[in-house]
């Protein structure tokens, strides 16, 4: 069963809900080899053992994405006619110890729920997609 934790992303409540979880944003790191994986595992162990909250690193580009997210969500709704609900963190009882912070969820007419991930690439990156004639995966 999926549980939606409605705390806004970045809030203390959201950070608390994520503590000790392997999240979608760090899953690739968990599967990798080397020091970045070791650092992630130590961070998660500290969260579980001592409740050590790590707010992580946020680059200027990441902050820009956060700042543009609400506008991007509105544009998506205007372009598609689909309603998007904001969510904080999703966990699934079938996958204990894991979670995902979605940028929104969309309820389909068929009754299923689909996650929305918003990306706000920098102008140079966007120009590259246009020049290459491709949509990023």
Place the predicted regions along the sequence by residue.
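Charged, glycine-rich intrinsically disordered N-terminal tails and low-complexity linkers that flank
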Residues: 1-67
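Mg2+/Mn2+-dependent nuclease catalytic core
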Residues: 55, 60-63, 67-137
């Amino acid at each position: 069963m999926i549980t939606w934790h409605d705390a806004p992303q970045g809030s203390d409540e959201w950070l608390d809900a994520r503590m000790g979880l392997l999240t979608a944003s760090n899953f690739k790191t968990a599967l990798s080899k080397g020091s970045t994986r070791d650092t992630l595992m130590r961070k998660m162990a500290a969260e579980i053992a001592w409740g050590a909250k790590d707010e992580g690193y946020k680059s200027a580009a990441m902050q820009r994405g956060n700042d543009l997210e609400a506008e991007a969500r509105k544009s998506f709704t205007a372009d598609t006619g689909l309603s998007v609900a904001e969510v904080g963190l999703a966990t699934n009882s079938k996958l204990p110890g894991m979670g995902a912070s979605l940028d929104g969820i969309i309820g389909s007419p068929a009754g299923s729920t689909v996650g929305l991930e918003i990306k706000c690439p920098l102008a140079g990156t966007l120009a590259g997609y246009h020049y290459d004639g491709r949509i990023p995966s």
